[in-house]
Amino acid sequence: MCGIAGYLGKKRFDTKEIKKVLDTMYRRGPDSNGFKEITYRKKFLSLFFSRLNIIDDNNRANQPFVYKDKYLIFNGEIYNHLELKSQLKNKGYNFKTQSDTEVLIKALDYWGEYGIKKLEGMWTFFFYDNTKKKGILSRDRFGEKPLFYYHKNDEFVFSSEIKTISKILN
């Protein structure tokens, strides 16, 4: 179980605010946490993550996961990640981790949003392509992994925890 959260709006987070947001997700992932801020059309895209190591406990698998100009925060497990990894290797992709997170970001890089149809498992993730200025927020077909969101005016917030959304907005 991991924790993910994101914010798109005009607010920037200082170090204390980042820690407070990450603290709300600590129980979901005590092994590591991460934060990334990306400027997006005069707004800020802030990605928060708390990690519970399951498949790959190497620090290279920490999140937000970055590949080229793409970013991913992911909670869940892709059961067929080895099959997808093999297909992607045949397309010329190389891998630095054993993580299904790396497989997911490269699957989305190669297949785009159609890569979601290839996934077998349980997940909630946010993928952002900074070149295309396009984001994908996805949840597995059965809703096994939690996902909550808030949208009003120029702010969009999502998280695997409701209390995290509240902390981001305050």
Where does each model-flagged region fall?
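Cysteine-centered catalytic environments shared across enzyme families
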Residues: 1-170
